[in-house]
């Protein structure tokens, strides 16, 4: 009987020792495999060109001051490029083969025929409201107009950033903005926006909530208005409802696969809303030519430098200007 018990104990001890040996062997083997795998990654990583969606590299100047003309850029064999331009450019060029000519020129910069798309727009305001930016990289040509510089900067803000917007019922509710990224965006054929700030007793500050004529006018007869008021303060809002809509919007972040080339003007547009910071030009460049052929030639010359400060694709394939949430 004692012999059987000793045999059982001995068998258990041998099993434990054998199991321990097997586990150590497996551990050593896995360590060896993982070490070799990490070493392989470390060795090949300098030679791999990948897209980093988390890195944002802003442009700090204009094309005519910063970038160097180059014909030896990356070969974008699997990427698409959309070039958006005002219809006046096509009318001025007046050449049925001009797009084919540009495609051949883009080919010299590494962009295969068929990878570059040309899309015109009639009105930059309408385009900005729903840009439909479907390509991997999207470059928007925007003509500078010194009579509407502030309007154009708002349009650039819409194009270069993604927004999450909710409908506003201004007839029933007061609204307040809670951060710098929170704005009220009004669109329509004729938008006149008036606001009345309220105190903690919901009484107007410098205005009467029952008298619209005492409200402060922040925009008058415009197609697009981005309204920025004092954060943390309730406001009574009045707009021309029949010709305008208003939405409470939050800026989600930059649309990394979009850049704007400003055609003309003394300086590149500044869309920085915070007056306490140094103005920042975010993927906005400037070309200083009068004729559209010259503009397109410049774009072809610098396209690979422009692409380097962008990220391929954005958060969604359908990168319309706004996300609506009911």
UniProtKB/Swiss-Prot annotation:
Pfam families: VP7 (PF00434). One of its GO terms (molecular function) is metal ion binding. Glycans are attached at residues 69, 146, 238. Residues 165-167 are annotated as: CNP motif. Ca(2+) 1 binds at residues 95, 206, 214, 216. One of its GO terms (cellular component) is host cell endoplasmic reticulum lumen. Residues 253-255 are annotated as: GPR motif. The keyword Isomerase does not apply. Disulfide bonds join 82-135, 165-249, 191-244, 196-207. Ca(2+) 2 binds at residues 177, 228-229, 301. Keywords: Calcium, Capsid protein, Disulfide bond, Glycoprotein, Host endoplasmic reticulum, Host-virus interaction, Metal-binding, Outer capsid protein, Signal, T=13 icosahedral capsid protein, Virion. It is found in: Virion; Host endoplasmic reticulum lumen. Residues 1-50 form the signal peptide. Transmembrane segments: none annotated. N-glycosylated. HAMAP family: Rota_VP7 (MF_04130), Rota_VP7_A (MF_04131). Homotrimer; disulfide-linked. 2 Ca(2+) ions bound at each subunit interface in the trimer hold the trimer together. Interacts with the intermediate capsid protein VP6. Interacts with the outer capsid protein VP5*. Calcium-binding protein that interacts with rotavirus cell receptors once the initial attachment by VP4 has been achieved. Rotavirus attachment and entry into the host cell probably involves multiple sequential contacts between the outer capsid proteins VP4 and VP7, and the cell receptors. Following entry into the host cell, low intracellular or intravesicular Ca(2+) concentration probably causes the calcium-stabilized VP7 trimers to dissociate from the virion. This step is probably necessary for the membrane-disrupting entry step and the release of VP4, which is locked onto the virion by VP7. Belongs to the rotavirus VP7 family. Some rotavirus strains are neuraminidase-sensitive and require sialic acid to attach to the cell surface. Some rotavirus strains are integrin-dependent. Some rotavirus strains depend on ganglioside for their entry into the host cell. Hsp70 also seems to be involved in the entry of some strains. This is Outer capsid glycoprotein VP7. It comes from Rotavirus A (strain RVA/Human/Japan/S2/1980/G2P1B[4]) (RV-A). The lineage of its organism: Viruses, Riboviria, Orthornavirae, Duplornaviricota, Resentoviricetes.
